[in-house]
Amino acid sequence: NSNIDKIPFHPYFTFKDIVGFIVMIFLLISLVLINPNLLGDPDNFIPANPLVTPAHIQPEWYFLFAYAILRSIPNKLGGVIALVLSIAILMILPFYNLSKFRGIQFYPINQILFWIMLVTVILLTWIGARPVEEPYVLLGQILTVIYFLYYLINPLVSKWWDNLLN
């Protein structure tokens, strides 16, 4: 019987996962209880004047990319639709991969597109924290187009690459 020679890895990776979970919970609790305003915007703590609208209202840092997309479209309804789509795409994304291979390491062009997308989201986040003025408006519009084009181009490149491999 070959079971005698096998090493049971179940306790090891289970213990590793439990330790990792405990460390992450500890870090989260430490952040929330010790310094809850660390990632907040200092402008949120300025007492409001109800007679004056603030010059720049901005959301939390994790929605700044969507805020930049909202501001980059001049039409109000179009901006709101783009804002909702920019977040809804992220929820649909796990069901979006229809490629033959389940890793991006087999698609070199998609690797380049991934890094372009990462830079695009970082720049959109930065632009979301800037005031609404030139050149940020034009740059936000260009990056918004790149953001949505990624979701159109990425599956086409994957299918093209799958056809090349056949």
From Swiss-Prot:
Look up the domain of life of the source.
Answer: Eukaryota
The keyword Lipoprotein is annotated on this UniProt entry = no
**Can you quote a single GO CC term?**
mitochondrial inner membrane
Q: What topology does the record note for this protein and the membrane? A: Multi-pass membrane protein
| TM stretches of this protein | 15-35, 77-97, 109-129, 136-156
**InterPro entries according to UniProt:** Cyt_b/b6_C, Cyt_b/b6_C_sf, Cytb/b6-like_sf, Cytochrome_b_C_euk/bac
Major localization class: mitochondrion
Q: How the cofactor binds, per note?
A: Binds 2 heme groups non-covalently.
Cofactor(s) for this UniProt protein = heme
Gene3D superfamilies, per the entry: Cytochrome Bc1 Complex, Chain C
Localization = Mitochondrion inner membrane
Give the molecular function GO annotations.
metal ion binding; ubiquinol-cytochrome-c reductase activity
Which Pfam family, any one of them, does this sequence belong to?
Cytochrom_B_C
Q: What else is known?
A: Heme 1 (or BL or b562) is low-potential and absorbs at about 562 nm, and heme 2 (or BH or b566) is high-potential and absorbs at about 566 nm.
Oligomer status and interactors: The main subunits of complex b-c1 are: cytochrome b, cytochrome c1 and the Rieske protein.
The protein, known as: Cytochrome b
Its organism's taxonomic lineage begins at:
Eukaryota, Metazoa, Ecdysozoa, Arthropoda, Hexapoda
Gene behind the chain: mt:Cyt-b
